[in-house]
Curated annotation (Swiss-Prot):
Catalytic activity: [(1->4)-N-acetyl-beta-D-glucosaminyl](n) + UDP-N-acetyl-alpha-D-glucosamine = [(1->4)-N-acetyl-beta-D-glucosaminyl](n+1) + UDP + H(+)
A UniProt-annotated Pfam family: Chitin_synth_2
Gene: CHS8
Subcellular location: Cell membrane
UniProt-recorded name of the protein: Chitin synthase 8
Glycosylated sites: 17, 312, 421, 471
Compositionally biased intervals (Pro residues): 61-73
UniProt keyword annotation of Glycosyltransferase present: yes
Phenotype of gene-disrupted mutants: Significantly impairs conidiation. Exhibits a significant reduced pathogenicity in Arabidopsis and cotton plants.
Residue ranges of coiled coil: none
Region span, Disordered: 1-73
């Protein structure tokens, strides 16, 4: 049996080991001081001996030294003692163990179970769509039989548009009449801004960080930036890994401590972690550098579980964290005025916030009341001042050849932006205004309350952080890897049915579209499989309201019958060519076309016209 890469890591017993690198610290302390910065930059550093520059000594004039910048300051390896820190806890660390026993699991059912499920689903997908297409072409006179499958999603979105209009009008009237006012708490909320990284380049990370620093109207809120880096991957074109340039360049000079046993990762092994703290442009930060790659979900479990146990002041329980690491990070928060954490603000390494994005998220969460546990913003494509064309064709290439050139294709930006508008439009706005159950809080722009309903162990560790076993079903395998944002929301609704989520359209974030077709298609595969698997499970998951069950059923059915829907569109085009304007003499056809026009017009205008919730 092949051994997975993570299985090569050795188990470490839960001991408190802090690597100090004292020898390097002593070496740097004994070294002569560096010349002043202005001397180095000016090329006038005096490197000659003290008695060689007297009046009687004439030295040949040497050429001026080249202009160089001083190296970044070395990290300060701190000395941490749990007994003297400002924050202390009584938690213990759970034992290191794999999430399942491979031999036992593989003996229960054959390893070909997933392969059997895969080909069975493909066979069913092809057979059902082929049967529907055959029936459509041979029995098109019975069109009313096929109408529910073709028009169910469209009619649902028309209902969404009408409901959104009524709800928005009602909300506007209540605000103008003074029945609904914004409540500002006496003590500003305290929150942590989390930035997960993997292989982002220097410019992407710096742009994202600066957008967090430049947020307006939140100066009175105590806050901290928490950057967690998953492994040591390099970005294309970078000489060092993302973790290296974050620790040693962008955040150089901070206090650093290394934990050989930091926490128990999702695979059951102890993860070595590097913690660095300091201030970035006046805002306190913590960098959490994981030695091994365990995926974004593992990083989210670490940060969210830590914030919950820190706020809850968990005592005498077993957690994933090394007690020394937990106390050290808790001391950093306490020393920076965050004795409690109200919110977690999440973004991605390739995302840029509007200047008032976080403020709009906070306002939306306040307006919802205590039952609203999370808010997401409006995610748009960052076009980087490029034209809106489908693609750009250089003059040196023929247009037809350039159409097949991956680096010149521009339509993925437009497709990405269109998909964002569709997903954030009618249904998500309906979920925000009417049902109160936005079933996806995108990780690139979200604000979540730190409480048991969102980050408690029952939600986070037992369900969200579940590692699929080899013999789990295909749906469980997909949900254990993809679409962590929508899966987290559905788990919250299932275990805490009274919890609600919202969407704040005025909180805007801009992301970079995939830069190649291979990455774009890979993203589509992950999003489609993850979201549709979650929609399928929501049909049967306990605690989900009936409206969301019905919408999920219609969404999954329409997606499953995609080839049949495309074939019906071709059939309509052929009928339009053959019959011409006679086809519009049918009143039912006119009604269907009007419904489609209303649907797309409503999607196009939802962001500009909708007032805040």
């Amino acid at each position: 049996m092949a051994v997975s890469p993570t299985a090569k890591r050795k188990f470490h017993h839960p001991f408190r080991n802090l690597s100090r690198q004292s020898s390097s610290a002593r070496t740097s302390a004994e070294a002569p001081p560096l010349p002043a910065v202005d001397q180095v930059l000016g090329g006038s550093a005096d490197v000659s001996g003290g008695d060689q520059g007297g009046p009687g000594n004439t030295q040949p004039e040497s050429p001026p030294a080249p202009l160089t910048r001083p190296p970044p300051p070395p990290p300060i390896f701190g000395s941490f003692s749990s007994s003297t820190c400002s924050f202390q806890s009584s938690i213990s660390q759970e034992d290191a163990k794999p999430p399942y026993h491979p031999d036992t699991e593989l003996k229960k059912v054959s390893r070909s179970l997933l392969r059997l499920q895969k080909y069975s689903l493909i066979l069913g997908f092809v057979s059902i769509n082929a049967g529907f297409i055959w029936a459509l072409w041979n029995y098109h006179h019975y069109w009313y039989i096929f109408l529910p499958f073709l028009a169910a999603n469209t009619f649902c979105q028309v209902i969404f548009a009408i409901s959104n209009t009524i709800a928005a009008t009602f909300t506007t009237l209540r605000r103008k009449l003074g029945f609904k006012k914004d409540v500002v708490p006496e003590n500003p909320e305290k929150f942590v801004m989390v930035l997960p990284c993997y292989n982002e380049d220097r410019q992407e990370v710096e742009t994202s960080l600066n957008s967090l620093i430049n947020q307006q109207n939140i100066d009175e809120h105590p806050r901290l930036i928490m950057v967690i880096v998953d492994g040591n991957a390099k970005a294309p074109g970078e000489e060092v890994s993302t973790q290296d340039f974050l620790l040693n360049d962008m955040f150089a000079g901070g206090e650093r401590i290394e934990f050989q046993n930091g926490y128990s990762a999702r695979d059951g092994f102890f993860m070595p972690v590097t913690i660095q703290q300091g201030k970035y442009r006046g805002v306190p930060y913590i960098i959490i550098g994981k030695k091994h790659n365990q995926g974004k979900r593992d990083s989210l479990c670490f940060v969210r579980s830590f914030l919950w146990h820190y706020k809850n002041r968990s005592a005498d329980i077993s957690t994933m964290f090394n007690p020394d690491l937990f106390d050290y990070m808790g001391s950093i928060l306490t020393d920076n005025g965050l004795d409690t954490i109200d919110y977690l603000c999440g973004m991605d390494g390739d995302t840029v916030f509007d200047d008032d994005c976080v403020y709009e998220l906070i306002k939306a969460l306040r307006r919802g009341g205590p039952d609203v546990v999370g808010v997401c913003g409006a995610v748009l494509v960052k076009f980087d001042e490029k034209p809106w064309g489908w693609w750009s064709v250089p003059s040196s290439q023929p247009p037809f050849f350039a159409w097949f050139t991956e680096t010149n294709l521009r339509n993925r930006n437009l497709l990405q932006n269109t998909e964002y508008n569709l997903t954030q439009g009618l249904r998500r706005e309906f979920q925000s205004r009417v049902s109160g159950k936005v079933n996806c809080l995108p990780g690139c722009c979200q604000l979540i309350r730190v409480q048991d309903a969102t980050f408690g162990d029952a939600v986070l560790r037992e369900r969200f952080g579940h590692v699929p076993k080899p013999n789990d079903t295909m749906t469980q395998q997909i949900m254990g890897v993809y679409s962590e944002d929508s899966i987290h929301a559905s788990i919250i609704f299932s275990r805490h049915p009274k919890s609600q989520t919202r969407q704040a359209l005025r909180a805007r974030a801009y992301t970079t579209a995939p830069q190649s077709w291979s990455v774009y298609l890979s993203q589509r595969k992950r999003w489609a499989l993850g979201s549709k698997s979650n929609e399928f499970v929501m049909v049967f998951r306990p605690g989900i309201i009936w409206v969301e069950r019905l919408c999920s059923f219609i969404t999954v059915t329409t997606w499953w019958l995609g080839p049949f829907v495309v074939a019906a569109m071709f059939g309509f085009a052929i009928a339009l060519v053959r019959q011409g304007k006679k086809i519009f003499e049918n009143h039912i056809m006119i009604g269907l076309m009007s419904v489609l026009a209303f649907r797309y017009a409503a999607k196009e205008k939802f962001k500009e016209k909708m007032p805040p919730v």
